[in-house]
């Protein structure tokens, strides 16, 4: 059976695992680098991106993930971690050829929900935006999947999927299922 890991350093790990299981696959909380060898794909959850990067450094995840050819899906802070560039600083894992701007929809009090049309998935996906980034620039090879108010909020490139919002905070698991069935199983 296909096994999907969720990096369990911070964020809504249980909620992501629930979406994996609702999609019909096994979800595993990844707490140790060695576990990366046991999975077919990895979800990088939201949270605080600076903290996430520090924890990934501390536990040795950065080096291993840069070396691995593993399909990855980043949500919110996970998107920032996958990006090659983050507004005036270099990226972290450098997997998606994009530039991300942090907190571009405002602070926590400015959080909102929006119905999204996500190319290839559905035209009625509920997006929960909490201190969300947006994708300011995409390079060649990156496919734009969705925008909100003219800002890019979902992209894919090869085996990498990135979204600005939190799909795991809704009951709609279609994005997770898409990641597994179109970017891992293909």
UniProtKB/Swiss-Prot annotation:
- Mind telling me which GO cellular component terms the entry cites? cytosol; glutaminase complex
Q: Which InterPro entries match?
A: Class_I_gatase-like, PdxT/SNO, PdxT/SNO_CS
The reply to whether Phosphoprotein figures as a keyword in the UniProt entry is: no
Identify the metabolic or biological route this protein is part of.
Answer: Cofactor biosynthesis; pyridoxal 5'-phosphate biosynthesis
Q: Per UniProt, which keywords does this protein have?
A: Glutamine amidotransferase, Hydrolase, Lyase, Pyridoxal phosphate
- This protein's superkingdom? Bacteria
Q: Which residues form the active site?
A: 76, 166, 168
SUPFAM superfamilies the record matches: Class I glutamine amidotransferase-like
Q: What Enzyme Commission number(s) appear in the record? A: 4.3.3.6, 3.5.1.2
Protein family per UniProt? Belongs to the glutaminase PdxT/SNO family.
How is the quaternary structure described?
Answer: In the presence of PdxS, forms a dodecamer of heterodimers. Only shows activity in the heterodimer.
Primary role: Catalyzes the hydrolysis of glutamine to glutamate and ammonia as part of the biosynthesis of pyridoxal 5'-phosphate. The resulting ammonia molecule is channeled to the active site of PdxS.
UniProt name for this protein: Pyridoxal 5'-phosphate synthase subunit PdxT
Species source reads Staphylococcus epidermidis (strain ATCC 35984 / DSM 28319 / BCRC 17069 / CCUG 31568 / BM 3577 / RP62A)
Give the organism's phylogenetic lineage: Bacteria, Bacillati, Bacillota, Bacilli, Bacillales
